[in-house]
Amino acid sequence: MVSSNQDLLISPSIPYGEIAVPPSKSHSLRAILFASLSKGTSIIENCLFSPDSQAMLTACEKMGAHVRRIGDSLHIQGNPDPHHCHPRYFHMGNSGIALRFLTALSTLSPTPTLITGSHTLKRRPIAPLLSSLKQLGAHIRQKTSSSIPFTIHGPLSPGHVTISGQDSQYASALAITAALAPYPLSFSIENLKERPWFDLTLDWLHSLNISFLRDQDSLTFPGGQSLESFSYSVPGDYSSAAFLASFGLLSSSSKPTILRNLSSQDSQGDKLLFSLLKQLGAHILIGKHHIEMHPSSFSGGEIDMDPFIDALPILAVLCCFAKNPSRLYNALGAKDKESNRIEAIAHELQKMGGSVHPTRDGLYIKPSRLHGAVVDSHNDHRIAMALAVAGVHASSGQTLLCNTQCINKSFPYFVIAAQTLHANVRHYQADFPLRSSFCR
């Protein structure tokens, strides 16, 4: 294996310090989309600028929004009636949110839209959403029923449909579309997973004065509603915070790691991870706008992953350092993310000496001493950052983490952030084979 400047060289170190958490990817993408569909000009402060954000911005500009970037803020003049544009082509990059949300919104237009994306986006399931949209009258042409590319257009017909809840983005996409449809639409969610992330979408709609009725997992939208412009400051990303927090929690330092730019009132699903760690015995202080991590030991256990399924890779690393074995379960959806995260994190941690084994719907993990190794990100940002944490807290040896460009998806300045916390993580480039250099 030959290293490139997309690789990271990681050495055991003792992290501590204070840092601002990057803006939330989930909130940034929703803010961009809603601003682009609103009347007037919206201002989004502290927006995350990443490949996913750019994919969403590009698509929204094709729908008629006018976007101006000023520093870390966006001024977006929306187009509340984007559905009578010329035929459109949306390249979603590697963004699952953009794929699902804009696919559903495209059915409000009689104009065909070609939906495509990166090679890795083709592995992200879309069939359950397309099936429900077809039942409402959407016209879809595709070469394969399971992935992009495809052409889609409406109009939809008023009615009721059932949507799979296996991925919360299906239900979120349908809710956003129903909110802006000119006619009544209702739907029921079958076996809703990742509930906090669907609730986050509904919180957004509620804050934008969209009316709907909710009876458990059935929702009814009256039709004929529109969005008004707004000002919004994106809070910190709890999913990204989990990696920074893990640097500090596993450290042998006597000093804490303090994470700022977080809102205790936020509905992000991965916020619940910090409450879980506290319940397991970790020394964590949760403030209104910050979290303070003190190096401490904690127990493993039986952990239902559904509320924070994106945290599976980093929780797998943490459980290697727990006082007793752990079983992470109810995480089938982790198989359909940017990688099969269950298989990917198990495979890579096994290289580092971890006793991490896939199960039908998660992982079984025994406490393990990790060592340096050559590992790979599987082109998945959360796998990459979890392995960086593992490398920093390995008991011996350096870790070469390959193919880390994917980290830009949610945390473009991850390496700088790690270094700010005194973690020995740096870009690495060499012109010779490296594998033998990283053996124990």
Curated annotation (Swiss-Prot):
This protein's UniProt keywords: Amino-acid biosynthesis, Aromatic amino acid biosynthesis, Cytoplasm, Transferase
Binding site for 3-phosphoshikimate: K25, S26, R30, S168, Q169, D310, K337
Catalytic function, reaction form: 3-phosphoshikimate + phosphoenolpyruvate = 5-O-(1-carboxyvinyl)-3-phosphoshikimate + phosphate
Enzyme's top EC category: transferase
Residue numbers annotated as active site: D310
GO molecular function, one term: 3-phosphoshikimate 1-carboxyvinyltransferase activity
Involved pathway(s): Metabolic intermediate biosynthesis; chorismate biosynthesis; chorismate from D-erythrose 4-phosphate and phosphoenolpyruvate: step 6/7
Sites where the protein binds phosphoenolpyruvate: K25, G96, R124, Q169, R341, R382, K409
EC number of the protein: 2.5.1.19
Domain of life: Bacteria
InterPro entries assigned to the protein according to its UniProt record, in alphabetical order: Enolpyruvate_Tfrase_dom, Enolpyruvate_Tfrase_sf, EPSP_synthase, EPSP_synthase_CS, RNA3'P_cycl/enolpyr_Trfase_a/b
GO biological process: amino acid biosynthetic process; aromatic amino acid family biosynthetic process; chorismate biosynthetic process
HAMAP family in the record: EPSP_synth
Protein task: Catalyzes the transfer of the enolpyruvyl moiety of phosphoenolpyruvate (PEP) to the 5-hydroxyl of shikimate-3-phosphate (S3P) to produce enolpyruvyl shikimate-3-phosphate and inorganic phosphate.
Complex formation: Monomer.
Membership in a protein family: Belongs to the EPSP synthase family.
Protein name: 3-phosphoshikimate 1-carboxyvinyltransferase
Source species: Chlamydia trachomatis serovar A (strain ATCC VR-571B / DSM 19440 / HAR-13)
